[in-house]
Design a protein with these regions (language model features):
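Short, surface-exposed ligand- or partner-binding patches at beta-edge/loop junctions that are enriched
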Residues: 71-82, 163-177
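Carbohydrate-binding surfaces of carbohydrate-active enzymes
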Residues: 1-145, 150-159
Length: 177
């Protein structure tokens, strides 16, 4: 999320390199773990890198650098930043325009569970599902996040506040990729 206080941000660093910067708007030092995956659209991990991150207050620093040649073809970069084991930022990086990729048709699985104050969706996919839009027929439903990228091998949880019954919610829940 662009407005989060700490972000993992991959960018083109020139000379055929891609770097991952961790940027913190916090007023205290940040420490976390950065993971970077070079993946195929089918979810195959071709390369994994990790780095411990220590970022001073209100600043940023580069932690991982990748050779752009690793991102040729239908490969992309997926980065995850955790703090005390909790995911606080994730991002993707593509080296080409979207219409240059063979995205294929993802098979998306959605499990719905009921909590005391909302429904919790657990979404997974067999291949990358870019720009997945989640919605229901009820305009009053409030999705924590309804426009997401789904990455194979990394299930995504989304909370939804709804006044519908569990059965009605399940039958009206839809997605579009």
């Amino acid at each position: 999320r662009a407005y989060a206080p700490v972000l993992a941000s991959p960018y083109s660093a020139g000379e055929g390199k891609v770097a991952v910067k961790v940027v913190s708007d916090r007023m205290e030092r940040f420490e976390g773990e950065l993971e970077a995956y070079v993946m195929g659209l089918d979810g195959k991990v071709m390369k994994k890198m990790t780095a411990g991150c220590k970022v001073e207050a209100n600043s940023g620093a580069d932690f991982i650098e990748i050779d752009g040649a690793d991102l040729e073809g239908d490969a992309f970069l997926y980065v995850r930043l955790t703090e005390d084991g909790e995911l606080i930022s994730e991002n993707t990086f593509f080296t080409r325009y979207p219409n240059r990729y063979d995205w294929g048709e993802p098979a998306i699985d959605i499990e719905v569970s009921e909590t005391t104050d909302c429904y919790e969706l657990t979404l997974s996919t067999d291949r990358i599902a870019r720009c997945t839009y989640l919605y229901t027929d009820n305009e009053n439903d409030c999705f924590e996040d309804n426009y997401i990228d789904l990455i194979p091998g990394f299930p995504r949880k989304v909370a939804v506040r709804s006044n519908m019954t569990y059965d009605n919610f399940n039958t009206t829940l839809k997605y579009q990729t």
